[in-house]
């Protein structure tokens, strides 16, 4: 554990300490609890490890409280001109573990430049900065894409106005989210809306994330029903029994066919969100290249706001 090491007296020594901890794994009472080089599962330990390290060597480490709150960290960085580390690839688990150390280096430099103590840096991040970032209350745009997401919905989830969820980083604010509840429910149970653009959180196990809300409950559509449906029985995700469901893009035809199934159950699909389809101009006469811009592109862009 951390207590087996000497306290670092430089950034280089602090980095060596951190690399050693994430590489050698975790031992508990003499037993190897997490194997060496298991960086994928080490991701789950980074946040609590940051608490211990920030007490052991506060000069170089800080408590990381932005897990599932990466949106706030990004806003703080934008507001105060802080360059965050490059995002490692999803499967680069060691690089993702090292993301925390790279943040430590960046905030160490920020602290020194601004004459802050370790405690003052923590107060800056989790009090001053959080209170100064803009909580934008913008309208939800019309959806341009529909996505499947999945996972159990527990009673506490259903009582929340919004919740943090795994999804595709390409998800845009306002997009439609078709929620498949996994076993033992094994059915599509509701349709939700993405309240934010998708982002990547390197220290979040599932990488891509969004905030979702505006849940509309629908009649359950079971996996068995979809497997028996003429259209969905041929759909690759249904054939995979919704494995890898989170962030699976739906075509406009997929969503239309889903509305068909929902309507057949007697549900008023007029209450459900519709995919945005721009109105194309009528009586278009294209003769030269400039006509494309004036008669098609400009009206299309105007209709999109």
Located regions from the model:
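C-terminal accessory module of base-excision DNA glycosylases/AP lyases that mediates lesion recognition
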Residues: 1-26, 30-33, 63-145, 259-280, ...
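Helix-hairpin-helix
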Residues: 35-56
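Short alpha-helix capping/helix-loop boundary micro-motifs
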Residues: 159-167
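Short coil-to-beta transition motif at edge beta-strands of beta-rich domains
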Residues: 167-181
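Short, charged beta-turn/beta-strand-edge "cap" motif at the junction between a beta-strand
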Residues: 181-187
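Aromatic- and Lys/Arg-enriched surface recognition patch
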Residues: 193-253
């Amino acid at each position: 554990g951390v207590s087996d090491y000497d306290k670092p007296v430089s950034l280089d020594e602090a980095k060596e300490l951190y690399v050693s901890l994430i590489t050698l794994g975790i031992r508990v009472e003499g037993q190897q609890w997490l194997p060496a080089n298991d960086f994928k599962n080490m991701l789950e330990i980074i946040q609590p490890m940051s608490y211990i390290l920030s007490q052991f060597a506060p000069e170089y480490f800080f408590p990381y409280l932005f897990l599932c709150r990466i949106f706030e960290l990004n806003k703080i960085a934008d507001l105060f001109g802080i360059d965050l580390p490059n995002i490692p690839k999803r499967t680069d688990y060691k690089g993702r573990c090292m993301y925390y150390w790279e943040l430590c280096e960046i905030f160490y430099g920020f602290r020194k430049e601004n004459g802050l103590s370790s405690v003052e840096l923590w107060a800056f991040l989790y009090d001053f900065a959080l209170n100064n970032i803009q909580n934008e209350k913008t309208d939800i745009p019309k959806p341009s894409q529909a996505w499947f997401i999945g996972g159990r919905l527990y009673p506490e989830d259903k009582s929340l106005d919004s919740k943090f969820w795994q999804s595709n980083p390409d998800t845009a604010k306002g997009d439609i989210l078709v929620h498949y509840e996994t076993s033992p429910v094994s059915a599509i149970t509701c349709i939700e809306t993405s309240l934010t653009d998708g982002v990547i959180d390197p220290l979040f196990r599932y990488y891509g994330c969004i905030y979702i809300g505006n849940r509309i409950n629908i009649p359950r559509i079971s996996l068995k029903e979809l497997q028996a449906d003429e259209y969905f029985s041929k759909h690759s995700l249904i054939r995979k029994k919704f494995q890898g469901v989170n962030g699976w893009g739906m075509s406009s035809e997929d969503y239309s066919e889903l509305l068909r199934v929902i309507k057949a159950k007697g549900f008023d699909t007029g209450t459900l969100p519709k995919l945005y389809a721009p109105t194309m101009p009528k009586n278009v006469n294209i003769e030269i290249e400039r006509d494309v811009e004036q008669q098609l592109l400009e009206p299309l862009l105007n209709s999109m706001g």
